[in-house]
């Protein structure tokens, strides 16, 4: 699982820099509607919806807006025919890239995704070409300052698979993706504040990127995330602190 924190940092950097709030809200609402349609409107029993609600709240979306999106998903309507589509390919430096999209038009989506790979020196692959390099996991992030021993005990008691301290003092906790909600609840009940919790694709191996290749991968991520239909971008690129300082 090495390298995921670098991916998370890249993702958080992008989210912090992205001033297009309207586009962010559109993507969040799509996910809320789709999650509710697929798994029902009860966030307590629908891990995907729970994660979507948490993301929406973290982005300062109002409860009313969230509830309306959930109601649309449960009740059906013109905007509930979205399908999850995952595209796989290779980015700069031979990095493996997975692009998770929500779309009602596959042709439109592929016309957005493919040029991003091409312009950044990568190429779109076939289904399964890089997916085997990732595991679907639940990811919980705890900010710096938590007591490691107490957090580890709480995480294990809640059913977590693994806990990894990060260089910045934060902690990443991994779970079976189906058990993300239960583990999260257990950790919260133990008194710890959750910074982020989501279902993610965790790379099993990573590719070290030098100062020349790293910016190319970051550009690819930015271009993909700017596509309207793209919800999440996962990759196995590893950017060291030394290289990051040069960017």
Curated annotation (Swiss-Prot):
The keyword Heme does not apply. One of its GO terms (cellular component) is cytosol. It holds the Pfam family Transcrip_reg. One of its GO terms (molecular function) is DNA binding. It is found in: Cytoplasm. Coiled coil: none annotated. One of its GO terms (biological process) is regulation of DNA-templated transcription. The keyword Cytoplasm applies. Belongs to the TACO1 family. HAMAP family: Transcrip_reg_TACO1. This is Probable transcriptional regulatory protein Asuc_1803. It comes from Actinobacillus succinogenes (strain ATCC 55618 / DSM 22257 / CCUG 43843 / 130Z).
């Amino acid at each position: 699982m090495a390298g995921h924190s670098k991916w998370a940092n890249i993702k958080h950097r992008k989210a912090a820099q992205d001033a297009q709030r309207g586009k962010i809200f559109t993507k969040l609402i799509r996910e809320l509607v789709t999650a509710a349609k697929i798994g029902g409107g009860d966030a307590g029993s629908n891990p995907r919806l729970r994660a979507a609600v948490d993301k929406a709240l973290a982005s300062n979306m109002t409860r009313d807006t969230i509830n309306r999106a959930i109601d649309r998903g449960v009740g059906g309507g013109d905007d509930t025919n979205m399908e999850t589509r995952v595209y796989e390919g290779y980015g700069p430096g031979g990095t493996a890239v997975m692009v998770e999209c929500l779309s009602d038009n596959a042709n439109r989506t592929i016309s957005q995704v493919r040029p991003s790979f091409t312009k950044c020196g990568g190429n779109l692959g076939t289904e399964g070409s890089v997916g085997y390099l990732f595991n679907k996991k639940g990811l919980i992030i705890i900010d710096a300052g938590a007591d490691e021993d107490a957090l580890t005990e709480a995480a294990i008691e809640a059913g977590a698979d693994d806990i990894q301290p990060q260089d910045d003092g934060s902690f990443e906790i991994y779970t079976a993706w189906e058990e993300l909600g239960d583990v999260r609840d257990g950790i919260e009940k133990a008194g710890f504040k959750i910074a982020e919790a989501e279902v993610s694709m965790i790379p099993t191996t990573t590719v070290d990127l030098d100062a020349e290749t790293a910016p190319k991968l970051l550009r690819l991520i930015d271009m993909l995330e700017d596509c309207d239909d793209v919800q999440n971008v996962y990759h196995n690129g590893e950017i060291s602190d030394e290289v990051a300082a040069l960017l």
